Amino acid sequence: MKDKCVLTEYTISSGLPRRLVLGLVSDLHESDPKDVLEILRKISPDLILVAGDTFERHGGTKDTQRGSDEGSVERMLRHLLMKLDDIFEVVFGKRDFNPEYSRRFLMEAGKIAPVFLSPGNHEWYFLPKDLDIMKESGTKLLDNRDCKVYIKDMTIRIGGLSSVPDIRW
């Protein structure tokens, strides 16, 4: 986020019988969510959609989990990318992130509106404590999944497409 929060408003004709206000948040990268939360409280969205990169999860030999349906080949490739990321940190230096900011964002956002999160290219995996905070905050993880949501007497479908980890960033 680099201390920059941008609000862009769009009005889209959806054909739904009622108006929905959606808050779309992306690329927090474990930065202070204060400004984002302030905007979300101000616009009072019906749903909050998180389009990836809330957490910085790459590199290392951590106790990790990408998703319950991860196959052995995907797991092997993810672990290979994690090792490459470790090498990049040795060569270029380790960056400072604060995972507490991501946890605070999800907890506070969940008090504003239902939250749906799709992983981004910086979220190669989730730690068990990340999944715990999603559960505790009521955040619905959409990792190549969709779900039906009943809101304002309407049923809508929300889906999340996961990013393939990208080491070029």
Residue positions per predicted region:
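Short, flexible loop segments at the rims of nucleotide/cofactor-binding pockets, characterized by
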Residues: 24-31, 92-96, 164-165
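Structural motif
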Residues: 20-22, 46-47, 156-157
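Short, glycine/serine-rich, charged loops/turns that create anion-binding
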Residues: 29, 55, 122-123, 163-165
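A short acidic, often aromatic-flanked loop/helix-cap motif at beta-alpha or helix-coil junctions
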Residues: 17-18, 147-150, 166
